């Protein structure tokens, strides 16, 4: 039982605890600590009971204090007064690492728990707090710095953070500069940045709203401000993404700069850009830091599908914005697709085969292949398949694409094709032992795994493994359940098989809610939690180690569905997380690093070198 006295000034509370010997009372004063602190401060002011005098390193001003008080607040003073050091017996101690402004701030804080900070006294206070190990004061200094960062002082705050190793402040300054770099360019404040911070900014994927040409010109301005800075030219230019500039910008603005023609490193950077732009089909397997999209925004992306209403096939490419909790559109395909295959190489999205018209028999399968470049939000067509195919599986493995099985107007397919981006061509590799369609696949350990599907109108439970190095198929342990039109993905060292459908009895289809994972090491299947709702012919993607199953068709409900279910492998739990904008079957999904959509339309910074007029190249 707790009892508080009505007189708030006393600040007393009592805890009553009954016992055999009578009631024991425990009292707590809420004001005692502050009263004691005030008492010690008054003793210090009056010079009473002080047992040591501190002298700052930059003068003769003296500060009488109490050893016990200083030792209780600082490990530095505790070690000095109790650790057998010579200062333990001295009555006057000179502190060479602290000036009088900083020492006074520290002593005032220890005796009052109060601290006033401004930019004039901050560094003196920081230096003293760091030297004397007064952690609360260090924390107050960090808060003061972070709360006051602006365009005018961010460079100076960054210098202070670096000098005193204030990691949180340094990180905040980096983020602030990245977010506001265009403004710093316009004011010229960026010219005050040290090389290390400017190089970090120019290398960052989080740097937005600046073209590579603007960044190059800014780097040149910084280098030319002072002669010694020219020593950093090559190191700084390594952070400019020259391959993403247009050819005319490289010729008109970059090659005209003297050091870009004379410095060997800079010359090689221009050669790299030229070679990259001359080989557009090879770009997915030529990716480097200098060719990557300047974005740290990775999202779940969906493509195509057939709409529930009117059975119209979609050509929409969408990303899910987790913060806004809404879908945003990217550049749509030139033609609609469903039952297609998608895969990602080097953050380029390939869309292969499928159908443009609704047709459950696959008789309208196509062979065309398109590639989406998120850096410019643009599509381009690449080499077509050797065979039209739909209801097939597509994997990206070792820089190649593999299109496995499927069906077409000619019937079910056992053939497998491999796309080589370096040659921009498809070639046949070892085919499957039997034709399959409606199967699923994933990759792990340099191998491609294909599960289930339908062969000669019969649902399968087999698992096959393809080794591209030997061009051979191997049989592995079969699934515990037959299924087709399911999905498959890899998380860690486990290969997950999810959903799909199979025959109920002899003539009707049934959703398969059961799921399982395969261990390649053990060649063994293990059941996991069942789906909340049936989904077949879906999109599947792994995002932040969670599995997202998108849209599809529910055979039990006889309709396309709009739901997105998420599976957490660590918790073995399913959750319905959000919906598609509309119900879509035969949709596909992946994860892709993209620009937020508001940065895409009409932005000159997103102009593809490939779209440059030929008379300027």
Curated annotation (Swiss-Prot):
Domain of life where this protein originates: Eukaryota
Presence of the UniProt keyword Cell cycle in the record: yes
All copies of domain BTB, residue ranges: 50-119
Cross-referenced Pfam families: BACK, BTB, Kelch_1, Kelch_KLHDC2_KLHL20_DRC7
Protein's pathway: Protein modification; protein ubiquitination
Chain segments carrying region Disordered: 595-617
SMART domains in alphabetical order: BACK, BTB, Kelch
Domain BACK span(s) in chain numbering: 154-255
Protein role: Substrate-specific adapter of a BCR (BTB-CUL3-RBX1) E3 ubiquitin-protein ligase complex required for mitotic progression and cytokinesis. The BCR(KLHL9-KLHL13) E3 ubiquitin ligase complex mediates the ubiquitination of AURKB and controls the dynamic behavior of AURKB on mitotic chromosomes and thereby coordinates faithful mitotic progression and completion of cytokinesis.
Name of the protein described by the UniProt record: Kelch-like protein 9
Species in which this protein is naturally found: Homo sapiens
């Amino acid at each position: 039982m707790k009892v508080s006295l009505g007189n708030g000034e006393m600040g007393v509370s009592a805890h009553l605890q009954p016992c055999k010997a009578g009631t024991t009372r425990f009292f707590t004063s809420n004001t005692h600590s502050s009263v004691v602190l005030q008492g010690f401060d008054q003793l210090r002011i009056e010079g009473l009971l002080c047992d040591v005098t501190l002298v700052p390193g930059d003068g003769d001003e003296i500060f009488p204090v109490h050893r016990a008080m200083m030792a209780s607040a600082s490990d530095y003073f505790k070690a000095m007064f109790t650790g057998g050091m010579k200062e333990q017996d001295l009555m006057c101690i000179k502190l060479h690492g602290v000036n009088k402004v900083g020492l006074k701030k520290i002593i005032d804080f220890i005796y009052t728990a109060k601290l006033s900070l401004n930019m004039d006294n901050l560094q003196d206070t920081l230096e003293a707090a760091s030297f004397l190990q007064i952690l609360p004061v260090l924390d107050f200094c960090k808060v003061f710095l972070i709360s006051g960062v602006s365009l005018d002082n961010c460079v100076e705050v960054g210098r202070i953070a670096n000098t005193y190793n204030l990691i949180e402040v340094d990180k905040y300054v980096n983020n602030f500069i990245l977010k506001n770099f265009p403004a710093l360019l316009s004011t010229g404040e960026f010219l005050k940045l040290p090389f290390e911070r400017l190089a970090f900014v120019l290398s960052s994927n989080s740097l937005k709203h600046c073209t590579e040409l603007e960044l190059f010109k800014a780097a040149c301005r910084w280098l030319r401000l002072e002669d010694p800075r020219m020593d950093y030219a090559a190191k700084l230019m390594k952070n400019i993404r020259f391959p993403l500039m247009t050819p005319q910008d490289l010729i008109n603005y970059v090659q005209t700069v003297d050091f870009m023609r004379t410095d060997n490193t800079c010359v090689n950077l221009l050669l790299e850009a030229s070679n990259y732009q001359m080989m557009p089909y090879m770009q997915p397997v030529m990716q480097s830091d200098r060719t990557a999209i300047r974005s740290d925004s990775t999202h779940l992306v969906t493509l195509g599908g057939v709409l529930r209403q009117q059975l119209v096939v979609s050509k929409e490419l969408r990303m899910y914005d987790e913060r806004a909790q809404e879908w945003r559109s990217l550049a749509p395909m030139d033609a609609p697709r469903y039952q297609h295959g998608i895969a990602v190489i080097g953050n380029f999205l390939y869309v292969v085969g499928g159908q443009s018209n609704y047709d459950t028999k696959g008789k309208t399968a196509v062979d065309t292949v398109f590639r989406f470049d998120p850096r410019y939000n643009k599509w381009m067509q690449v080499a077509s398949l050797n065979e039209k195919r739909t209801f097939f599986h597509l994997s990206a493995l070792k820089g190649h694409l593999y299109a496995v099985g499927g069906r077409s107007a000619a019937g079910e397919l056992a053939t497998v094709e491999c796309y080589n981006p370096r040659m921009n061509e498809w070639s046949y590799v070892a085919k499957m032992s039997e034709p399959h369609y409606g199967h699923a696949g994933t990759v792990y350990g340099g191998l491609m795994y294909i599960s289930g599907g339908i062969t000669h109108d019969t649902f399968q439970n087999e698992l096959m493994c393809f080794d591209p190095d030997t061009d051979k198929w191997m049989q592995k342990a079969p699934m515990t359940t037959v299924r087709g039109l399911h999905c498959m993905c890899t998380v860690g060292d486990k290969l997950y098989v999810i959903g799909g459908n199979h025959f109920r009895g002899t003539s009707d289809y049934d959703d398969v809610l059961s799921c399982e994972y395969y261990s390649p090491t053990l060649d063994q299947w293990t059941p996991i939690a069942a789906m909340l709702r049936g989904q077949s012919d879906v999109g599947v993607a792994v995002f932040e180690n969670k599995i997202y199953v998108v849209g599809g068709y529910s055979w039990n409900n006889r309709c396309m569905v709009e739901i997105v279910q998420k599976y957490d492998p660590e918790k073995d739990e399913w959750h319905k997380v959000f919906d598609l904008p509309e119900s879509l079957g035969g949709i596909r999904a992946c994860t892709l690093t993209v620009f937020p959509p508001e940065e895409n339309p009409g932005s000159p910074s997103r102009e593809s070198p490939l779209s440059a007029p030929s008379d300027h190249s």
